[in-house]
Swiss-Prot record:
Subcellular location: Secreted
Originating organism: Aspergillus fumigatus (strain ATCC MYA-4609 / CBS 101355 / FGSC A1100 / Af293)
Cleavable signal peptide: 1-21
Stated name of the protein: Beta-mannosidase A
Keyword annotations: Carbohydrate metabolism, Glycoprotein, Glycosidase, Hydrolase, Polysaccharide degradation, Secreted, Signal
Length: 926
């Protein structure tokens, strides 16, 4: 299918041929036309954009109608052209596209310019001669092909690689693994399958004079002298700044490079002068300089210190000292290292189990990684704005998170997103875009991937927030075992192909372009046996290790058997948890953005079909069978542990059920995060927790903690609480009755304090003799460690009624945050009930909420009993978060809570419509 779309460029501007310089035309804007022969429609277009967005704006389609839009990608190639003025006198003219999604054919002045087949690459085309020979007003055409159709065509070709049945994971559109496009565009279990096409990133026309260079890409690599990617850097060594520029234009004669490094906050100059060892390789110029190791202020992640940043300006000159190109990038000085080295004798002596490490170290310090996994924040990247991402990242830091895993296969993040992470101290574990599939290894595919890898590694390498490059998502831990089960005799072939792509190809490309970042071939891995960069396979992976008592690598864990959700004996014991979770419903307010009122029922067709867990496995618009399984899992989770909503009003009942699924999700994540954090002081020396997932791509049941419009689910509030630096946590074996209480700290030095243990009944009255439990326990917890402060058995306690009892755990301590000059106070509160919430003899807490304009805070109080899961909720019209939520509130102890408005208009009327509820309200029939 071909689409013809065109706009005429303005007449060339005459000028004397001696005029030199550079003329760059940004093609962004509204002066484009989108035409489709499939729909026989022509509508106004935009750049950057994608087909669905312009059709939606023109009123042709409704983006909310997901079952229809699934097929638009099959029928809607796109063409766009801007109108602008070009200069006739420049020596060279280039078309530069930062991102075309995905299969595009470009013509200029009716002449074929080139084609693209990779969404993740920057493309540039020399149109100098075409422009000179153009006899009429120049016309630019970009014709986009259907990615699903082209993927299917490739799959049917005689030389297409095939895999055993059942290995490749099809969510909706098949054959995604054959093409270099955002894999989740073909459907995933948390999002739609729109398969958009279009110019999703900015595009330019670049005109150069005789000697000028246009900077396509910049690689600034900052590392300690002698640093090697997979070994811990020596923090006593000076800094090396390696600057490399990729350019368009003639190779300069005897070029030189100069550098100026300024403090981004104060403007003071850290270093300036000529770079040394300047070399030219192809269309890249590279030079280095050395900076005293103590001169720069270090960049630290959130919660560990300041995010000190520097502006680095690189200038390229020719042998006549004429400036040919200049570029400025903001960066920071830090080392970040993924330690996968074998456990040492010293570590064994400390009680750490044998095996290998798997944790991150920042500037030479190991730290506890706290965070989540980020997916594409929208099905259409042109809608992702800086303001929207700033709001999301505010929620990340407010949630006490210091790292996000940038999941494959979405897309490589835009530079402005890394900029935000740099500012806010959010480490970004980044991945190449391969996920839950085996991929071809033919020469053409590998060549395409190589260009993609080099471009993106170089593009983002200057960001101090960059923490890791991983080869792909779950390839080693999921796909290789699936291949072995499906084809045991051919398993060596799939291992060989895996190593050819992720180790023999990608690893050397990463290490050739950065000395500062570690590379791991897969997101979930047991690490490596050894690294030999001169070997054909430079890293020997440790596959399927079963050594008893030894721990290797990181873990992911999903268990939808809700009967064992809170049995921590089922949680994986490892060095680092990089994925775990369970899905829940979004709030009523979010559903109302996407669903008609008559469909606001838990099992309505629209609601069920927006649940893509489990996916259709093909292009089916009536996936009730698989979707119902996921709905059933949420239902069973609620029914097993929480009061079952049964309200007379159908919308209120739907809202209560949505909230109930969020309670289950939040408690499950809390249980696991506490377990993993406690592992910091256990033999496994567990030093990381990244839950699945941070945010939503649309309004639907997913694993997200933040809904599509930015509203926090219960999960994000609970994760914020349990990610505090020092926490107190109960661990209950409900089979044996054993109860243990631990204090866990991620500070870098010991902390001290006390924990009050208070038993009350659900009316709020103290239980006699505190049920035989000590009222106060002192603690000292080591750096990055945990300590047991109390152990008992429920059968040994003097509890009159297990169903009418709750233990309140209140921690008060003192410690020093990393890089802080003085100690500070820490408080944390947790609770424990000896039966699950559904079996509690709940009392009506008689909650009241009021707002004070003077303090700008809400006051919540309970007058009738203990309020469990106290939940403040706000109406539509604004987006933000409460500073505390989903907490326990004792009668007679009012709590003040602020609301942080991120977007929208918080009026007096809006404030008065804030509501409060508790677990009691879940069971009350209105």
């Amino acid at each position: 299918m071909h689409v013809k779309a065109e706009t005429v460029l303005a007449l060339l501007t005459p000028a004397p041929p001696s005029v030199v310089g550079q003329h760059v035309v940004d093609l962004s804007g509204d002066g484009w036309t989108l035409s489709s022969t499939a729909l026989n429609r022509t509508v106004p277009g935009h750049l950057p954009s994608q087909v669905h967005l312009d059709l939606f704006e023109a009123g042709v389609i409704d983006i909310m109608a997901s079952m229809i839009l699934t097929f638009v990608g099959l029928r809607m190639p796109i063409g766009r052209i801007p109108a602008t003025r070009l200069k006739a006198y420049f020596e060279s003219t280039w078309l530069v596209f930062d991102g075309l999604d995905t299969f595009a054919t470009i013509t200029f002045c009716d002449q074929h310019v080139g084609s693209t087949d990779n969404q993740f690459r920057q493309h540039h085309f020399d149109v100098s001669q075409i422009l000179k020979e153009c006899k009429q007003d120049p016309v630019l055409r970009i014709n986009f092909g259907s990615a699903p159709n082209i993927a299917n065509t490739i799959a049917k070709s005689p030389d297409a690689e095939e895999w055993p049945p059942g290995v490749q994971i099809t969510n909706e559109y098949p054959n995604r693994w054959y093409i270099r496009k955002e894999q989740s565009d073909f459907g995933w279990d948390w999002g739609p399958a729109f398969a958009p096409v279009g110019p999703w990133k900015p595009s330019y026309i670049v005109q150069n004079g005789h000697a000028e260079l246009y900077v396509l890409n910049t690689d600034i690599d900052i590392y300690r002298q002698g640093q090697i990617n997979y070994l811990p850097p020596d923090q006593s060594q000076p800094w090396i700044v390696n600057a490399s520029i990729d350019f368009l234009g003639p190779v300069p004669c005897k070029p030189s490079m100069s550098i100026e490094i300024k403090d981004a906050a104060t403007g003071s100059v850290l270093s300036s002068g000529l770079l040394q060892n300047v070399t030219v390789s192809g269309k890249s110029i590279t030079g280095t300089t050395t900076i005293d190791g103590d001169a720069p202020k270090l960049w630290w992640p959130s919660g560990m210190g300041k995010q000190n940043l520097y502006n680095v300006t690189i200038t390229v000159q020719n042998d006549m000292k004429k400036s040919l190109a200049k570029v400025t990038k903001r960066t920071g000085f830090r080392t970040i290292f993924l330690n996968q080295r074998n456990i040492t004798d010293d570590q064994l002596a400390q009680g750490i189990a044998p095996g290998a490490n798997w944790h991150f170290e920042i500037n030479g310090y190991e730290f506890y990684t706290k965070g989540s996994n980020i997916i594409p924040p929208d099905a259409f990247w042109p809608r992702v704005t800086q303001a929207r991402m700033a709001r999301l990242f505010d929620a990340v830091t407010a949630g006490n998170q210091n790292m996000l895993r940038v999941w494959a296969s979405g897309a490589y993040l835009h530079d402005f997103i890394y900029d935000l992470a740099d500012e806010k101290g959010i480490l970004l574990w980044s991945e190449f875009q391969f996920s839950d599939a085996l991929y071809p290894v033919n020469d053409a595919f590998l060549e395409n991937v190589a260009a993609e890898v080099v471009y993106n590694v170089r593009r983002v390498n200057h960001h101090p927030s960059l923490a890791l490059w991983a080869g792909g998502n779950e390839i080693e831990s999921l796909m290789l075992p699936m291949a072995r089960r499906a084809d045991p005799t051919g398993y060596s072939k799939y291992i060989g192909e895996y190593e050819k792509l992720y180790i023999s190809l990608i690893l050397p490309l990463v290490y050739e372009n950065t000395r500062s970042i570690t590379y791991s071939p897969s997101s979930t891995t047991e690490g490596y046996l050894y690294v030999n960069l001169s070997a054909p396979v430079p890293m020997a992976e440790r596959y399927s290790n079963t050594t008893p008592g030894s721990y290797y690598g990181d873990t992911d864990y999903y268990n939808y058997d809700t009967s064992v959700s809170f049995d921590y004996n089922h949680y994986p014991v490892g060095r680092f948890a990089n994925e775990f979770g369970f899905h829940s419903m979004p709030s009523l307010q979010t559903w109302q953005q996407a669903v008609d009122p008559e469909d606001l029922q838990f099992n309505s067709s629209v609601v069920v079909l927006r649940n893509h867990h489990y996916t259709a496995g093909g292009l089916f618009t009536d996936n009730f069978k698989n979707s119902s399984k996921g709905m059933g899992e949420m239902t069973m989770g609620v029914e097993a542990y929480y009061p079952i909503p049964s309200k007379s009003d159908s919308v209120a009942n739907f809202s209560a059920w949505c909230h109930a699924t969020q309670l289950f999700q939040a408690d499950l994540y809390k249980s696991q995060i506490q377990f993993y954090r406690r592992g910091s002081g256990m033999p496994e020396r567990q030093l990381g927790s990244l839950y699945w997932q941070l945010e939503d791509i649309w309004q639907a049941p997913t694993w997200a903690g933040i809904e599509y419009d930015g509203r926090w689910k219960v999960l994000h509030y609970v994760a914020r609480d349990i990610y505090q630096p020092i926490i107190v946590s109960p661990f209950w074996n409900y089979t044996t009755g054993r109860l243990e209480v631990y204090v866990t700290s991620d500070l870098w030095e010991p902390a001290q304090g006390t924990v009050n243990l208070t038993w009350v009944d659900l009316s709020g009255k103290s239980i006699a003799n505190n049920a035989g439990t000590p009222e106060t326990v002192s603690f000292t917890v080591g750096a990055l460690n945990t300590t047991n402060i109390y152990t008992t058995n429920i059968s040994e306690l003097s509890l009159p009624d297990l169903k009418d009892s709750i233990l309140i755990l209140s921690l008060s301590g003192e410690g020093r945050l990393p890089n802080a000059s003085s100690k500070k106070a820490f408080v944390h509160q947790n609770h424990f009930t000896p039966v699950f919430p559904k079996d509690l003899s709940l009392k009506d807490p008689k909650l009241e909420v009021s707002y004070s304009p003077e303090s700008r805070k809400f006051t919540v109080q309970a007058t009738g009993g203990v309020s469990l899961y106290t939940w403040l909720d706000y109406p539509a019209g604004a987006v933000g978060y409460f500073e505390a939520n989903a907490f326990v509130l004792l009668p007679g102890v009012p709590k003040e809570v602020s609301f942080v408005a991120q977007e929208g208009n918080v009026t007096d009327d809006w404030l008065q419509r804030v509501t409060v509820q508790s677990l009691w309200d879940q069971k009350v029939r209105d």
